[in-house]
Amino acid sequence: MVGVLLSVTAGSAYLGSAVVARHRAQAAADLAALAAAARVAAGPETACAQANAVARAMRVSTIGCAVDDLDVVVTIEVRLAVGGWGSARAAARAGPTKHA
């Protein structure tokens, strides 16, 4: 019985950690993409450097940064806090809206 309770508790902690990591990854990707979009006029290198700086400040890893015209797409990865197994990834796009 104790083993079952410990297994359920460990599983719940891991699931909770995964949800938190996913939300952290999306928030960091959104903020990094907005920061990069604000610097896109200075060039793609400057924009991606700004995205990396924001990611470092939020203690997450930048997987990718792509600039296409005025659009910036940033991909972020966050390691799970519990167990250290796996990670959560999220991507965000920032730039002007496209009008038809």
Tell where the protein language model's regions lie, with residue ranges.
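Alpha-helical scaffold segments in soluble metabolic enzymes
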Residues: 31, 50, 91
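Short amphipathic secondary-structure patches
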Residues: 34-80, 96
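Low-complexity, S/T/G/P-rich flexible repeat/linker segments used as non-globular hinges
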Residues: 82-100
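Alpha-helical assembly-interface signal, strongest on the long, hydrophobic N-terminal helix that forms
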Residues: 1-47
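A general, composition-driven signal for non-globular sequence regions
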Residues: 16-20, 73, 87
